[in-house]
Amino acid sequence: MTETFRNPITENGADPFVVRFEDRYYYVYSADGGVAVSSADNIHHLKQDGKCIFRPAAGKPYSKELWAPEIHYLDGGWYCYVAADDGANVNHHMYVLKSTNGRPDGDYELVGMLDDGSGCWAIDGTVLPYGGRLYFVWSGWESRENTHQNIYIAPM
């Protein structure tokens, strides 16, 4: 008999991301002004009771509104991609963090903002492997004003 998923797996979980590593599922989510990860050996045991892996210092361009974090294992390390701003939505940008101990549930430190040169609003980024290369895909505005939202892709 095949197990079924219990729905909802968790309540109040906007922008969920789950990855499997070493026979465990890791669920990454925004929580209390930071990014948290919980893990379980079975996906239907995941809960929002995880460890905070990154909490930004106050007063930074990435201190507020951390949205849609994702963790990816790339080039021998764990990276977290998350949208954040300084409290003004127009300043939402994508940031990359790196695990300090090489584990998906380790502490993460800021690497920097992902910058395509436009300075435009950017959220909901993900990594896309395609044709032996990596691409970054995100949703963003076409200008500094919210006139039109598009999906963008760029080689990493």
Please provide the spans of the model-predicted regions:
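Carbohydrate-active catalytic/glycan-binding domains of CAZyme proteins
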Residues: M1-M156
